[in-house]
UniProtKB/Swiss-Prot annotation:
<dbReference type="InterPro" id="IPR002218">
    <property type="entry name" value="MnmG-rel"/>
</dbReference>
<keyword id="KW-0521">NADP</keyword>
<dbReference type="InterPro" id="IPR040131">
    <property type="entry name" value="MnmG_N"/>
</dbReference>
<keyword id="KW-0285">Flavoprotein</keyword>
<dbReference type="InterPro" id="IPR020595">
    <property type="entry name" value="MnmG-rel_CS"/>
</dbReference>
<keyword id="KW-0819">tRNA processing</keyword>
<dbReference type="InterPro" id="IPR036188">
    <property type="entry name" value="FAD/NAD-bd_sf"/>
</dbReference>
<dbReference type="GO" id="GO:0047151">
    <property type="term" value="F:tRNA (uracil(54)-C5)-methyltransferase activity, 5,10-methylenetetrahydrofolate-dependent"/>
</dbReference>
<dbReference type="GO" id="GO:0002098">
    <property type="term" value="P:tRNA wobble uridine modification"/>
</dbReference>
<keyword id="KW-0489">Methyltransferase</keyword>
<keyword id="KW-0274">FAD</keyword>
<keyword id="KW-0808">Transferase</keyword>
<comment type="similarity">
    <text>Belongs to the MnmG family. TrmFO subfamily.</text>
</comment>
<feature type="binding site">
    <location>
        <begin position="10"/>
        <end position="15"/>
    </location>
    <ligand>
        <name>FAD</name>
    </ligand>
</feature>
<protein>
    <recommendedName>
        <fullName>Methylenetetrahydrofolate--tRNA-(uracil-5-)-methyltransferase TrmFO</fullName>
        <ecNumber>2.1.1.74</ecNumber>
    </recommendedName>
</protein>
<dbReference type="GO" id="GO:0005829">
    <property type="term" value="C:cytosol"/>
</dbReference>
<dbReference type="GO" id="GO:0050660">
    <property type="term" value="F:flavin adenine dinucleotide binding"/>
</dbReference>
Length: 445
């Protein structure tokens, strides 16, 4: 019997899942949640796993990225997904829940578990010893964020998420977009989408008129962050040529189709993953509504059929530079007994938060039992997501949702997208079952 408890800090989806996995392994766990002693600007109740935005966990079909992640978690006995299934409400092809009942039941389950102690208190410092799981989310309290920054390093904690859209590489028209670096310096590292004057002016006008998302009050108060990383629509509003002398400058780039004529403007895309399946729109951090982003950005030559795996966002979001700090087991490299999960590590979405909680909780339990920590196969959605956030380029790291672009390709080309995604799902679930069967213990811990 292990007497020393594991501490889980933060009672959101990730923390709830982590605490459950630890307790189910027979290890005492203290789950710290500051509400209702201290609330955040986005929360409205004292319940664990409160859903502060939508009540939807995303698409259910396994040929959708979130649906595949749901199914992986079901097979791994996730408490969060089991409760989402139990308290689901009709939502077409999505897994949506009665949010009040969902959060209340999860709170009761954890509070009634004999090995779980629920402590309502604000934690202002990371415990310096023992096994600890950080799951404090995007609205981590100022005091704890300051301590985390001291631990991680000044440059490895972000407080505002200003991210450009990310596009699936196969949806980019390579007959228009060309690989090159400015002035041909170094390796051809960017995909470039050239515009003539007419195309640029049309794009500029549509961008100026596009509808923006509403900022929450606490985000509006932090608008000073925008000056350091201006939205592309703000640049457009400052004049016809502002973008052309900023991120859309054409200097040093020649369109191979018209080598003697410099483009009027160029949108650059930077590779987001080692396999070149994901591409980031350089300088296109934006606060446009998602539908408007799709409409306006598909006006760019070469991106007419672009598939966005992540939309641009600008909002308050505390997250660490995971590639610099974490391994794919979600342990801190500098302190393996400290783990983290949820939006704090740069994953996006409810289901990804639960997945991170599952892995961090499982590995925390394994550490307590003297077992080696585990990582999932990278052919699974869970495994590929945590491999991505722990191995992406640290300099440009931004949060990432589950998507098929981070999975390894098949050796043979499958042109039909739905068929390809279905085969990704089949491979993932087969590899997950094989991985589970290889573990020597009766359960994962």
């Amino acid at each position: 019997m292990i007497d020393r408890p594991i501490h889980v800090i933060g009672g959101g989806l990730a923390g709830t899942e982590a605490a459950w996995q630890i307790a189910q392994a027979g290890i005492p766990v203290i789950l710290h949640e500051m509400r209702p002693i201290r609330s955040s600007p986005a929360h409205h109740s004292q319940f664990l796993a409160e859903l502060v935005c939508s009540n939807s966990f995303g698409a259910m079909a396994v040929d959708r990225a979130t649906g595949l992640l749901h199914e992986e978690l079901r097979r791994l006995n996730s408490l969060v997904i089991a409760q989402a299934d139990q308290h689901s409400v009709p939502a077409g092809g999505a897994l949506a829940v009665d949010r009040g009942v969902f959060s209340r039941n999860l709170t009761e389950i954890l509070a009634n578990h004999p090995l779980v102690t629920l402590k309502r208190q604000e934690i202002t410092e990371i415990p310096r010893d023992g096994i600890v799981v950080l799951t404090t989310g995007p609205l981590t309290s100022a005091a704890l964020a300051a301590d985390l920054q001291n631990f991680a390093g000044l440059d490895y904690l972000s407080f505002f998420d200003a991210a450009s859209p990310i596009i699936l590489g196969e949806s980019i028209d390579r007959s228009i977009a060309f690989l090159a670096s400015r002035y041909d310096k170094g390796e051809a590292a960017y995909l470039n989408c050239p515009m003539d004057r007419e195309q640029y002016l049309h794009f500029w006008q549509e961008l100026k008129q596009a509808e923006q998302a509403e900022l929450k009050d606490f985000e509006r108060e932090n608008a000073k962050f925008f000056e350091a990383c201006l939205p592309i629509e703000e640049l457009a509003s400052r004049g016809e040529d502002t973008m052309r002398f900023g991120p859309l400058k054409p200097v040093g780039l020649a369109d191979p189709r018209y080598p003697d004529q410099r483009p009027y403007a160029v949108i650059q895309l930077r590779m987001e993953d080692k396999a070149g399946q994901l591409w980031n729109m350089v300088g296109f951090q934006t606060n446009l509504k998602w539908g408007e982003q799709t409409r306006v950005f598909r006006l760019i030559p070469g991106l007419e059929k672009a598939e966005f795996v992540r939309m641009g966002v600008m909002h308050k979001n505390t997250f660490i530079n995971s590639p610099q700090l974490l391994s794919s087991s979600l342990q801190f490299k500098s302190r393996p007994t400290l783990l983290a999960a949820g939006q704090l590590i740069g994953t996006e979405g409810y289901t990804a938060a639960a997945a991170g909680g599952w892995l961090a909780g499982t590995n925390a339990a394994r550490l307590a039992l003297g077992l080696e920590t585990v990582t999932l196969p990278t052919t699974t959605m869970m495994g590929s997501l945590f491999e991505f956030i722990s191995s992406a380029e640290p300099k440009h790291f931004q949060p990432m949702p589950p998507n098929f672009g981070i999975l390894p390709n098949f050796t043979r080309k499958i042109r039909n997208k739905r068929e390809r995604y279905g085969q990704y799902a089949d491979r993932s679930l087969q590899d997950l079952e094989a991985w589970m069967n290889q573990l020597k213990t009766p359960c994962l811990v």
